[in-house]
Amino acid sequence: MSMFNKVVKEFQWGQHKVRLETGEVARQASGAVIVDVEDTVVLATVVGAKSAKPGQDFFPLTVDYLEKTYSAGKIPGGFFRREGRPSEHETLTSRLIDRPLRPLFPEGFYNEVQVVIHVLSVNPEIPADIPALIGASAALAVSGLPFNGPVGAARVAYIDNAYVLNPTRDQLKASSLDLVVAGTERAVLMVESEADQLSEEVMLGAVVFGHEQMQIAIDAIHELVRDGGKPEWDWQPAAKNEALIARVTELAQNDLLAAYQLRDKQARSAKLKEVYAATSAKLEEDALAAGTVAADKATVGNVLFDIEAKIVRSQILNGEPRIDGRDTRTVRPIEIRTGVLPRTHGSALFTRGETQALVVATLGTKGDEQIIDALEGEYRERFMLHYNMPPFATGETGRVGSPKRREIGHGRLAKRALVKCLPSADEFGYSIRVVSEITESNGSSSMASVCGGCLALMDAGVPMKAHVAGIAMGLILEGNKFAVLTDILGDEDHLGDMDFKVAGTEQGVTALQMDIKIQGITKEIMQVALAQAKEGRLHILGKMTSAVSGANTQLSEFAPRMITVKINPEKIRDVIGKGGSVIRALTEETGTTIDISDDGVVTIASTSSEGMAEAKKRIEQITAEIEVGQVYEGTVLKLLDFGAIVNLLPGKDGLLHISEIVNERVKDINDYLKEGQQVKVKVIQTDEKGRVRLSAKALLNEAAAAAQSDTPPQQ
C-alpha cells in the first residue's frame, strides 16, 4: 500500500494534454499541485498562516515564480553556478499569477499567504506561465483556504483570422496577438496582451474565447478538489464595529465630502490627512473620557477609507462630476514638448493633467542589444523600455534604487504597446532603448510612458509605423449600475473596481491590460470600456499628431551613424585577428564600433563619418583578395639576402625576390631597397598556400615597352 494519497486528473485542452496531480509531493504545504503540459512541468505550492499577525490591516499575499535551469538541462552561469535573483521574466510571471488570485480572497482576510511555483521541466514549445497560473489556482483550491476560486487561464493567439488556444512558441511567431486571460466560471479577472493593431472587436472576441476555453481547466480543478482537497478552513471575518463606524462617520463624513470638492491633488491630499488626524485625535479623547482603549489607527483608517470610497463612487454613479471636476468621458488637458534634452538622441515631455513623463530614446548598435539567457535558449532584445518612478513624483520621500516589481511591469506594458509599430531591423538597424522617467504621477503613468515613448522615438528619427497612444480606464460597479471612467486619476484607481489600460494606433489596439479588484466583470462592461477607451485614445492621438506629425528625417548629431560592408564569411577571422587584435585596433584607431554577423555583414557605427570611412577602407583592404597581375603600392617590411618582404595590404605580404627588383644583377639589396620604403610591385604568382611572389622589374619592362609604342604604362 502506498504512503501517498495521490490524486490525478487528466484532460485534453485544445492541442495539449494536461495532467494535474496532488498528494505526493510537498505534502506539508497547505496545498501543492503538479501540472504537466506536454513535458512542461511546474510544482505550485501554497502555505497560509492560520492566523493574522496582530495589528495586520492588509492582505499579505506573495507570489514567487521560479525557473530552475535544470528544467532545461542547463547549469547556471556565474561563479556560484546556482540560480540567483529573479529574472525580469520571472518577476513579470509572478505578477501575472498574483493579479487574478488576489481579488478572490475574502475582505478582511489578513492571514499571510505565500504561493511558490517552481518550473521543474521545460518543453521549449510550451511556455510555463499558463501551467503555473493553473497550478497556483489548483493549489489554493485544494488547500482549503478561504478562496473564491478556482481561477482558470488561457493564452490566445490570432492566426489567419482565427483564434488559437494555448499556441506553441512557433505558432506565436506567426500570430498577430499574444493574449493571456484569467477568470472564474462566471467572469474575467485579468487580461494581459500584445497585438499588431487589431480591432476592439477582435480583442474582445479573444477575451471571450479564452474565458470559454478555460472552463475545461476550472472543471478539472473542481474534480481535483473533490477527490484530493483538504477540509475548508473555518474562517469568519471579524464582526464590524458598528458603533465605531457610526462615530467615525459622524465625525468625518462632512469633512471628507468637503475634501473631495477640492480639484487639486495636493490640496485634497493635505485636507484628507487633516481629517484622518483629527478623527483619530477625537476618538482618543472619547476613549479617555470613557476610560476605554481607543481603536488603533489602522482600523480607523480602514473605516475612513470605506467612507471615502462610498462618497466618490456614489457621486460618479449619480452623474455628479468626478474628483477633478470632469465627466466620465473627458481626457485631462495634454501638453507635449519634444527635443527637450540637448545631447540625447531623442526626448519628449508628455504631460496629461497631473501625470508627467520625461521620456528619452537612445540609439545603439547591435553590440548594445540585450542578451537574454532564457530556459528556452539565448536570444537578443533589440528594443528595451525601462520605466522609473521616483518618490518625488507623488510628493513623497522613499527608497531610490533598483526597480520594483511595479516598475518592471509598467515598463513591460509600455514596451508591448510600442514594439509592433517599430521598424524592422532591416529597415532601421539600430538597437533602441527608451527610458521613461515619471516626474509627476496622478494616475495612468504607464500610458503616459507609451505616449511619451512614441514621441521620443520619433524625435530620435525612428521611423515608427504609426503614432501610438495609451489610456487608462476605470470602473465603478454597484449592483447593476456601473460607470466607466476615461483617463482615471490615482484616487479613482485606488477607490474603483478596475484598472483597464488600452494602447494603440488609429488603426487598432497594440496592448491591453486589465486588472479587476472585484470578482469579475461581464462582456457588456468590457465592450463599453473598449469603446470609450478608443474614443479617448483617438483624442490623445490627435494631440500627438498635431505636435509631431512624423519621425525626424535626420538623426541627432550625437547619435551613431551606421554603414554596412559585405565580406566573404571566410574572411571574418582576418578582420577579428588573433585574440581579437585586429578588430580591437580598428575600433580604437578609428573611433568606431564594429559588429560582424556570421553571414559576413559588417556593421560600422560611429558619430564620425571620417572614422567610419577609414574603418570601411581598412576592412576592405583586410578582406581583399590578392590577384595575379594586380599592381600594389607596398611597404618594405624586411630585407633578406635573397629579397624583400613587402606588405601589400593589412595582413597580406609578398616576396620580392632579388632577381625581380631590377633587370641587372643585384649584388647588395641594400643599394636598392630600405625597410619602410614604398615600392610599386606587380603580383606575378600565388600558390595554394597563400604565398605571393612579386616583381618590380616587370613594371619597369612594361614601362619601357610602353614608351617604345607610345602606349601609356599600366598604373
From Swiss-Prot:
It comes from the Bacteria. The keyword Cell membrane does not apply. This is Polyribonucleotide nucleotidyltransferase. It catalyses: RNA(n+1) + phosphate = RNA(n) + a ribonucleoside 5'-diphosphate. One of its GO terms (cellular component) is cytosol. Residues 560-619 form the KH domain. Its EC number is 2.7.7.8. It is found in: Cytoplasm. One of its GO terms (molecular function) is magnesium ion binding. The keyword Plastid does not apply. Keywords: Cytoplasm, Magnesium, Metal-binding, Nucleotidyltransferase, RNA-binding, Transferase. Belongs to the polyribonucleotide nucleotidyltransferase family. SMART domains: KH, S1. Its cofactor is Mg(2+). CDD domains: KH-I_PNPase, RNase_PH_PNPase_1, RNase_PH_PNPase_2, S1_PNPase. Involved in mRNA degradation. Catalyzes the phosphorolysis of single-stranded polyribonucleotides processively in the 3'- to 5'-direction. One of its GO terms (biological process) is mRNA catabolic process.
